[in-house]
Curated annotation (Swiss-Prot):
InterPro entries: CitD, Mal_deCO2ase/Cit_lyase_ACP. Pfam families: ACP. Covalent carrier of the coenzyme of citrate lyase. HAMAP family: CitD. This is Citrate lyase acyl carrier protein. It is found in: Cytoplasm. The keyword Phosphoprotein applies. Belongs to the CitD family. Oligomer with a subunit composition of (alpha,beta,gamma)6. Keywords: Cytoplasm, Phosphoprotein. One of its GO terms (cellular component) is cytoplasm. It comes from Streptococcus pyogenes serotype M1. The modification O-(phosphoribosyl dephospho-coenzyme A)serine is found at residue 14. NCBIfam families: citD, PRK13253.1.
């Protein structure tokens, strides 16, 4: 999926995550995380965001995430929403997304 513009999903409310996805000219995925639970779960959150991007076939993006204690399902949903907005796609392939849940 090609990231064309900057897009945001989520909020800074408790138990949520605000994620910003932007194009990356370096053709890599970079993830910046600000989390109150970074020492405990930072690596897991980064890995979950990265895997979601891979599942969406994103090869180049700058991602900034501000976590306020979001669950995995929320992190994944916010990432999916931000990527689709950044790519300018308003249709979701629910069968494909459901196939990730093995």
């Amino acid at each position: 999926m090609d990231i064309k513009q900057t897009a945001v999903a989520g909020s800074l409310e408790s138990s949520d995550l605000m994620i910003t996805v932007s194009p990356n000219d370096e053709q890599t995925i970079t993830i910046t995380l600000d989390s109150s639970v970074e020492k405990q779960f930072g690596n897991h959150i980064r890995q979950l965001i990265h895997q979601t991007l891979v599942n969406l076939k994103v090869t180049a993006a700058k991602v900034e995430a501000v976590d306020k204690g979001a669950l995995d399902c929320t992190i994944q949903a916010r990432t999916i929403a931000a990527v689709h907005r950044a790519a300018g796609i308003d249709q979701y392939d629910w069968k494909e997304i459901d196939s990730w849940n093995v």
